[in-house]
Amino acid sequence: MASKSSRSQEHIRNFCIIAHIDHGKSTLADRLLESTGTVDNRGKKTQMLDDLALEQQRGITIKARAVAMRYKRDGIEYELNLIDTPGHVDFQYEVSRSLACCEGALLLVDAFQGVEAQTVANAFAAMEHDLTIVPVINKIDLIHARPDEVAEEMMNSLGTDPDECKRVSAKTGEGVAALLDAIVDSVPAPTGDPKAVLQAMVFDSNYDDFRGAITYIRVMQGTVRKGQKIKFLRAGSVHDVVELGQFAPSRVPCDELVAGQVGYLICNIKSLGDVHIGDTISIAGNDPAPALPGYDRPKRMVYCGLFPSDGQDFSELRDALERLAVNDPSFEFEPETSDALGFGFRCGFLGLLHMEIVQQRLEQESDIDLVQTAPNVTYEITDKRGVTKNIHKPQDVPDPGDIEKFCQPIVRCNVIVPEEYIGPVMKLCQERRGIQKGHEVLGASRAMLTYDIPLAEVIYDLHDRIKSCTRGYGTLDYEMVGYEEADLCRLDILVNGNRVDALSVVCHRADADRRGRAVAKKLKSEIERHMFEVAVQAAIGSRVIARETVPAMRKNVTAKCYGGDITRKRKLLQKQKEGKKRMKAVGNVEISQKAFMAVLTDGE
């Protein structure tokens, strides 16, 4: 690639690939990179754009990526900028950032699995951004592929024309050349004046220990050059451009990027707070360009506590979280303390997979062993004085007598299932207190069920349960619809009369008895026996609803007595009883990390 990267705007195409998880986005991206000669056979590997170790390991895309490809047709060289996006519902924020940088989208659907819940959600998101959609049916090489039926499904659910669907096999490369032509013909060229005042959007960033923050940008107006002074409008900071360039797919420096191009900037930014994803970059002068409308800030739906297993690692955990926040601004954290687990952080996530991924990235990238508390959602509570506040952790829920109104978040779930599994899925949604809102037939054998379900019922294992009762064919997508009043309560766990804050949960009153008994029973089997008996109780306010007792270890004090008067034995047993009573009054019950983890990972 030449060092001077700018080119005529009508020869630039910015597009992304959107699809349900596992429909072959990253594999198709690999074929496009090979077909355009962006990577040679030496640099070839599978899932070239998934460069996080976790992405390669789990076979899913977590972070958005950008790569510039050169494609020659009829003697004209086109620049095709592909922005790879994640497919899972938890990474919707990454998808929306990618869509804001594109003019077109390849809507990829598996030729066997057909339209899935996330396909519908991503297609509507692309339509909201006014993107030109190119429908693509992938995996046509499969023995069980049914491209004609899938094209009909796409027409029924998304309104696409079956004749316009491009048919490809990302695995074998069949149909990829025709797809490249379709991108050039269908996706509009970017608009924007290269001579106007610089206006560029920050759509991602990551942190390099040697170079500082590497900022991914899409230039909307004007031109950015090496050595130029630029300003981050939201942060208000001014920096010199030390290096800029494009990804192919590794970094390739160039002298300038013009309106319509996608690339990266390095400004030796060491302060993590200076780069905000969604910020606007302009010239550092008196009249910079106006700020672009930012992305919608993502709402954190799920909260949990993260604590280092070893208290010595607290400052390392804080540094690791700060580094990760530069690259993934969709989660937030604040310090918190727990009597049981010590110092740690309360973290907010977009969903359960997002929480799991962040925890694994922290453990892999910073080598810290973590303990995680039970996930919970954000509740809205109005007290007797009429003051409404958001509650992120169960410990902050006031006593039942102080609550006027207790509201929980409700999500609208779209579940796409084969017809023969509709019954079990409806039963499952009703068990989770769901209210049916719609039932739509998608094709000959599949339907989309729409339910409003409390988010707290979704975050634990609804996705897994849907997969298991549909033999893996059901798919789930959800979006927030608002808050609704419900009969909720805080369930506390008391050990030896003391509340264990890390085990408190908010649950529906009708489910509290079952849940309390299950946790007490599990904890009884995990707590080590002491010299005195330990009571494990589940309580709502001051009312105990379940109790288990861990029996005491006792020494056989009457072993040395043989024959003789019974009063001698009674005297020794009474003395032992009094000693245990004294011990119980002053004794502390240690709950091991293992016991916590057993209860928290039990799904209860």
Curated annotation (Swiss-Prot):
Location of the protein in the cell: Cell inner membrane
Start and end residues of each tr-type G domain: 10-191
UniProt topology in membrane: Peripheral membrane protein
One cellular component term from this protein's GO annotations in UniProt: plasma membrane
Classification via PROSITE patterns: G_TR_2
GO molecular function annotations of the record: GTP binding; GTPase activity; ribosome binding; translation elongation factor activity
Domain of life according to the entry: Bacteria
InterPro entries (UniProt xref): EF-4, EFG_III/V, EFG_V-like, EFTu-like_2, LepA_C_sf, LepA_CTD, LepA_IV, P-loop_NTPase
Keyword list, A-Z: Cell inner membrane, Cell membrane, GTP-binding, Hydrolase, Membrane, Nucleotide-binding, Protein biosynthesis
Record-listed E.C. numbers: 3.6.5.n1
GO biological process: positive regulation of translation
HAMAP family: LepA
Family note: Belongs to the TRAFAC class translation factor GTPase superfamily. Classic translation factor GTPase family. LepA subfamily.
Function noted in UniProt: Required for accurate and efficient protein synthesis under certain stress conditions. May act as a fidelity factor of the translation reaction, by catalyzing a one-codon backward translocation of tRNAs on improperly translocated ribosomes. Back-translocation proceeds from a post-translocation (POST) complex to a pre-translocation (PRE) complex, thus giving elongation factor G a second chance to translocate the tRNAs correctly. Binds to ribosomes in a GTP-dependent manner.
UniProt name for this protein: Elongation factor 4 1
Gene: lepA1
